[in-house]
């Protein structure tokens, strides 16, 4: 597994976990429209609250799978592709809301990292990392 791919994989995953846990109820300056938290942001997009929880749970699951992919490489590519697809949706929602690029730059960044991870990592024929490889990361 390429070091650049591993960095992209881990960075994308940690970024998503940060947004959906520590920054969930915070005004970040990157929220859609004038939203001050995640609930308001989904309202700006015209999406109901249950959609927010479904999207959040899926993104957290994909990000977690990407982290596990550091030890079980074969799950990296599907998780990375899934996260990249969700980021396309996030970018689309920002565009729909008329947000300037600055507000969806984080979504573009995570999309780029997840796509890079999907391209470089996750060869389905690659065996699981050995204990020595895991410890050397």
Language-model regions, residue ranges each:
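Short amphipathic, positively biased membrane-proximal segments
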Residues: 1-137
